[in-house]
A protein has these predicted regions:
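Feature captures outer-membrane beta-barrel proteins of Gram-negative bacteria and organelles
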Residues: 101-104, 129-142, 163-175, 310-332, ...
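Short Pro-Gly-centered beta-turn/loop motif in secreted/extracellular proteins
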Residues: 21-30, 254-260, 636-662, 674, ...
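Transmembrane beta-strands of outer-membrane beta-barrel pores
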Residues: 88, 117-121, 143, 152-156, ...
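Membrane-embedded beta-strand positions of outer-membrane beta-barrel proteins
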Residues: 111-115, 148, 180-182, 295-299, ...
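Post-signal-peptide, soluble extracytosolic/periplasmic N-terminal scaffold domains
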Residues: 1-216, 520-594
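A short, amphipathic beta-strand motif
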Residues: 3, 220-222, 611-615, 688-697
């Protein structure tokens, strides 16, 4: 059953119950292993309890093990609640889930599909039809997850091609908090460019860490003179609050909050005295918190459709957070005729976060010999507290002429072998900048972004920058922006853009948006879109768009519409558009088929990790952990989105259930591994239901609240107002017992016979019958 410690769910366990001497009530008992899994420190228990635990096969109740410790059993929901003083709870990072609770799921397979067909009619160019089918197949066997992704395109012109995107087997390596991948996949692209490969890869997975230990956040250290309250804020927002004991304290489980803003720490002592200090907080993408590390190791062949052969390569990376200020990282790549090494680090200071790394590469090119080069990358991030200016990310990268990345090197080698020249275009430098400036008094926000790229063997550079302003007036949101772009050939253009958005009431989630844009060549576009849903659960949503384009002096008016239906088994979409010269129609179907031990279950599109619900006879019940999800006629439903290594709550709303079916519990929690398919079994009690109007033989009403039991003593319900009772789980005919005052003063028996059962219908009213409750001897 589920075990909840101090209002925090810790997992599902097999528990033993033992009766206490002189007490009929049995209590759950715990051994050292179970206490450890629950995060409880038995060294804080009473000496007598510690001595009992030291015995072989010891099992003691938590009640009485130390002051204020208690347990409460919720038998109906199969849940045990423990209340334990904080002194006996081991400290762990927030949202920590013991790996023993990670669920590998069941053996099952699935096929996820995305089918789209487009039809275009053009007055001068005729008709054209194209169809796309995307497939994602998987099979889970024990800890292994087998996956394949591919796509098929075909058209009425006879073009047809299936493309395999990735095929691999993957599993967790729990002690290393890592993933092992075998087959066709991709590298992460953290330090080096992302590569498609066929081979083997072992890499750490940050998702296995508690959410409070992911990403970068500084460790906050200080000293308290008493039992003190510590409040940590960032830009006026409270991030964390806790109580610490006298002496030095350390808080190392702050959630990462993006690119920063210094932390304001206030320590309030027991006598009301306060003292404050600040901790610098800014981060570039490769920053790690103190003591954290990441690594990857890949061995395989490079996959690139432009290459005639697939060279073998090996790549390794390592990152480590030395302390609050410094993170370091390094990496290497080796292949035939190629080698590179990278070394870098990041520094967090009061002036912001700085990152720098240098990559040295050596490439052998046919006819040109050995080429050596370097690539320097610089990055910076900072939030200026005085003005709240957010320099989200500024990066600069410069590569010398002799520098090649692995894919660049292999393509250049191939071009030189095949054509005798080097036609592959390579970057010389790249610069990006992003700024955001909130304005005081709710006057909106200014934002600026810019990028520039230059290339070897090409004069000129690509340049793009944009400045914009966004705000809202009551419920009307608006954005105004201006963009300028120039390519390396000197072609330039300016675009001015204005957009408005307005929600239209809350009943059906409707909104109206419009936009206008115009460029320096005189081309313009105006567009208005109405979106909404026909119900609050968004089973059916729609959009209608009207637009006018002016291009090279020609006007074109287009009217288009789209419709999306979300069902429990699939999503169906369609669109129509009509312009001056062109009309288009499309139809799409997205969904999945999940194969398991009891058959096939249809589903909405799946994410990497999803769950399978089984609730016998609960067809029609709504699953609240998603949109438009219902239990099917076989008692199964798929929850298409779960978060791996985190506690996920999955709930069923009994509304819509037949009155002849009762859910024993309406929610469960699961902690799935990445790619797992956990099975969530919701126990149900089936049987016919009825409202019985019954009185005692002398005409007196039955006592309000009296228990209604079957002949085996199982509780079926209770007597309500007006001597009516509602009972579920009945047979077509039989007897039920009404008992009050624990049977010491009254019992009576009702004999019933229900009308022939009609077809089970969700929400159908229970049968109404009249009867008399015949007295039976009272229990002593």
């Amino acid at each position: 059953m589920d075990v909840v410690v101090n209002d925090e769910w810790h997992g599902r366990f097999n528990l033993s119950f033992k009766a206490r001497p002189g007490n009929e009530e049995a209590l759950a008992c715990f051994d050292n292993a179970l206490l450890e899994r629950l995060g409880l420190d038995s060294s804080k228990f009473y000496p007598q309890a510690q001595q009992q635990l030291s015995a072989a096969q010891a099992c003691i109740p938590i009640d009485g093990a130390l002051d204020d410790a208690s347990s409460r059993l919720d038998f109906a929901n199969q849940r045990l609640y423990l209340s334990v003083p904080q002194i006996a709870v081991k400290r762990s990072a927030r949202e920590t889930v013991d790996p023993s609770q990670w669920d590998s799921g069941i053996t099952a397979g699935f096929l996820d599909y995305n089918l789209n067909t487009y039809s275009t009619q053009h007055r001068s160019q005729g008709n054209f039809r194209q169809t796309y089918l995307g497939l994602g197949a998987g099979l889970n066997i024990g800890p292994w997850r087998l996956r394949h992704d591919g796509s098929l395109n075909w058209s009425d012109q006879g073009q047809q091609r299936y493309q395999s995107i990735a095929s691999y087997a993957q599993r967790d390596i729990t002690p290393w908090r890592s993933q092992l991948t075998l087959g066709e996949s991709y590298t992460s692209g953290g330090l080096f460019d992302s590569l498609s490969y066929t081979g083997i890869r072992l890499a750490s997975d940050d998702r296995m860490l508690p959410a409070s230990l992911r990403g970068y956040a500084p460790v906050v250290r200080g000293i308290a003179s008493s039992n003190a309250r510590v409040l940590i804020r960032q830009r006026g927002v409270t991030l964390h609050e806790t109580t610490v004991a006298p002496g030095a304290f350390e808080i190392d489980d702050l959630y990462a909050t993006g690119y920063g803003g210094d932390l304001e720490v206030t320590v309030t002592e027991a006598d009301g005295r306060e003292h404050s200090f600040s901790v610098p907080y800014a981060a570039v993408p490769l920053s790690l918190r103190a003591g954290a590390s990441r690594y990857s190791a890949t061995l395989g062949t490079l996959r690139n459709q432009q290459l005639n052969s697939n060279p073998v390569f090996v790549e390794g990376t390592w990152q480590y957070g030395l302390n609050n200020l410094v993170s370091t990282y390094s990496g290497m790549t080796l292949a035939s005729g190629y080698g590179s090494a990278l070394l870098g680090g990041s520094l967090n200071t009061e002036l912001g976060a700085f990152g720098a790394d240098l990559t040295q590469a050596r490439t052998h090119l046919p006819g040109l010999g050995s080429q050596q080069g370097q690539s320097l990358r610089l990055s910076y991030a900072k939030t200026l507290s005085e003005t709240d200016t957010q320099i989200a990310l500024a990066t600069y990268r410069y590569s010398t002429r002799g520098f090649y990345g692995l894919e660049d090197a292999q393509l250049s080698r191939q071009f030189l072998r095949d054509a005798g020249d080097q036609r592959y275009q390579r970057h010389r430098s790249r610069t990006t900048l992003s700024l955001a400036q909130p304005l005081a008094l709710n006057y909106g926000q200014l934002h600026l972004s810019a990028s520039a790229s230059s290339y070897w063997d090409h004069a000129g550079s690509d340049l793009s920058y944009s400045i914009g302003y966004s705000n809202h007036y009551k419920t009307l949101g608006y954005t105004l922006s201006s963009t300028r772009e120039r390519d390396r050939f000197g072609r330039a253009g300016n675009t001015l853009y204005l957009s408005l958005s307005l929600p239209l009431g809350s009943e059906r989630v409707r909104s109206l948006s419009s936009s206008i844009s115009r460029d320096s060549n005189g081309n313009s576009r105006a567009q208005a879109t109405l979106t909404g849903a026909t119900s609050d659960d968004q089973h059916l949503s729609y959009g209608i768009t009207a637009s006018q384009d002016r291009h090279h002096g020609q006007n074109n008016h287009t009217l288009s519409s789209n419709l999306l239906y979300r069902g429990s088994a699939a999503e169906l979409s369609g669109s129509l558009s009509q312009g001056r010269h062109t009309s288009q129609a499309s139809l799409g179907l997205r969904g999945a088929i999940v194969a398991h031990a009891d058959g096939l279950t249809l589903s909405q599109p799946l994410s990497e990790t999803f769950g399978l619900i089984h609730a016998k006879d609960a067809d029609g019940a709504r699953v609240t952990s998603g949109t438009a999800l219902k239990v099917d006629s076989s008692g199964y439903a798929v929850v298409p989105n779960l978060t791996p290594y985190r506690r996920n709550t999955v709930a069923i709303d009994p509304k819509g259930l037949s009155t002849d079916v009762e859910l024993q519990s309406s929610s469960q929690q699961t902690v799935p591994r990445a790619g797992a398919i956990p099975l969530l079994v919701f126990q149900t009690r089936s049987g016919r239901s009825a409202v019985i109007h019954a009185r005692q033989v002398d005409g007196q009403p039955l006592p309000f609240g009296a228990a209604v039991l079957d002949t085996n003593g199982n509780e079926l319900g209770a007597v309500g107002q007006g001597s009516q009772l509602f009972a579920r789980g009945l047979q077509d005919e039989g007897e039920i017992i009404v008992r009050w005052d624990n049977g010491s003063t009254g019992n009576c028996r009702i004999t019933y016979a229900l009308p022939a059962a009609a077809k089970k219908t969700a929400g159908a009213a229970p049968q109404n019958i009249q009867s008399v409750c015949l007295a039976t001897p009272a229990h002593p």
